[in-house]
Amino acid sequence: MFKHVLLLLIAVVALPGCLSSDANDQESTKVCKPLSFTMKALDGKDVNLGKYQGKVVLIVNVASKCGLTPQYEQLQALHDKYSEKSLAILGFPCNQFLWQEPGTAEQIQEFCRVNYGVTFDMFAKVNVKGDEACDLYKTLTALDTEPVGPGKISWNFEKFVIGRDGEVVARFSPRTKPDDPAVLKVIEAELAKEV
């Protein structure tokens, strides 16, 4: 009898937790769209990424002291060439890869302006991997996109292309340059689509 009471007690105590877990699992499996988040700009102001809806968006995690930092020049060239056609480039500084972005917001902004003439939108420093990753990057890395697929960010300058419909259409590795023909093909195809 004691065994039955104990089992009943365990079931009563555990059941709400299981049900709660199911509800939380269902909630956590809802995939948010990347442009549904509000992020801090480099100047500290909140930016609702929904303002980019209807544009083609290139999201890149960036760093000032990385071997790939010269990609800022190509990102700026893309901005210069395509911003009038509704391409938005969003740079997200990150210090998670060998501490290659140690600067303050002011230092990052100055570095980008002086060395690369950056005028595309830059955001406050974020984490892009691990438990501390911001929700935007948790969403981006959960998606199965071509050619890289889902999974953690491998290094600075990983690139995500978001179409006019707000869906991620491509993900490119850090070593794939912003002006690589594969990147340009995706961007131009998305720009050609009607809003």
Predicted regions: what they are:
Residues 21-50, 70, 135:
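N-terminal "domain-start" segment that seeds a small globular fold
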Residues 5-13:
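Sec-dependent N-terminal signal peptides
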Residues 106-156:
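Short, internal strand/loop/helix patches
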Residues 41, 61-65:
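Amphipathic alpha-helical repeat scaffolds
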Residues 55-56, 65, 69-93, 113-116:
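Conserved helix-turn-beta segment immediately C-terminal to the redox Cys motif
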Residues 135-138, 142-195:
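Thiol-/selenol-based redox modules, centered on thioredoxin-like
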Residues 86-103, 119-130:
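Thiol-based oxidoreductase modules, predominantly thioredoxin-like and allied folds used
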Residues 16-17:
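C-terminal motif of bacterial Sec signal peptides marking the signal peptidase cleavage site
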